[in-house]
Amino acid sequence: FNSENLFFDLESQTQRSILSATGRGYYVLALIAPNSEPTNHFLRDIAPYKDAFEKWGQKMVLLFADASEAERFQKGDFANLPNTIVWGTDINQTNFNEVYTNMKLTNPTRPVIIVADTFNRIVFISQGYSIGLGEQLNNVINKLK
């Protein structure tokens, strides 16, 4: 996986690299699908750890497959998400395809959540529905401090 890959940043309305969005160090990348239970569960699962993720200070880049998916997402349904989230879309699904191929995933189900660093080392991956994902991510980032 390459942190130099581009995505479309929904706030700035520009293409940028994951590295430019996250700065050096570790980050969370979540390749998500709107209005799907596994993605909804993931978002609800990280909300209780909002303060911990904000204290960690690293970015969480959440990417939809394309603009139409981003438009269907109801952000207002998810209160109390960390302010370190960068919302975007995956340009030509480059990021998803690289993670899918390089991590040898066998199912194209979203969400796919990774914790990686800007030297392209993935230290955590989860795909699909996973109970306690917020806690798992919190445990991983605490070990990285």
Where do the protein language model's features map onto the residues?
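Extracellular/periplasmic catalytic domains that process cell-envelope and extracellular macromolecules
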Residues: 20-23, 54-55, 79-81, 105-108
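A short beta-strand-turn-helix
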Residues: 1-27, 34, 44-48
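Short acidic-hydrophobic, aromatic-tinged amphipathic segments that line or gate anion-handling sites
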Residues: 9-11, 84-95, 126
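Hydrophobic beta-strand anchors of alpha/beta hydrolase catalytic cores
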Residues: 28-29, 113
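Thiol-/selenol-based redox modules, centered on thioredoxin-like
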Residues: 108-145
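Structural micro-motif
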Residues: 82-86, 102-114
